[in-house]
Amino acid sequence: DRTIEAVELLQLPAPKFENSDNAFKVFIYTYKPFEQLTTQEKLRALYQHVTLLFIQQDFATNETLRLRFGLGEKKASLISKLVASAKESRLIKNFDPSSESKRYVKYVPVWA
C-alpha cells in the first residue's frame, strides 16, 4: 500500500503488477495527464484508489477520485463516466446501494 500511496501523491499512472513463476514484477510509470491515460490505466488507478481507501477504513468518492487524477470540478463528468465503466466492469460498487444520493456516493471494491 505504500507504493500506491506514493503513486497517488504524485498523480502517476497506477502501477501494474505481474506475477510469474519465478518473479513478481511491479511496473511504475512516469506522469501522464488524465487525457493521455488509456481506459485500462484509468480503471486500474480508480480500482487501486478505491481499494487503498477501503483498507485504510475510508471511502472513495467522486471528489477523492478527481483529486487522485488532478481534475477540477469542471471535469466531474469524466470521473462519473469512469466510475460507471468501473461498475460495469465489476471493479467497484456503491457502499450503500440503497442511497439515492448521486453527489455523495461512497465506493468500495466489489469484493468488499
Language-model region placement:
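C-terminal regulatory or interaction extensions
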Residues: D1-A112
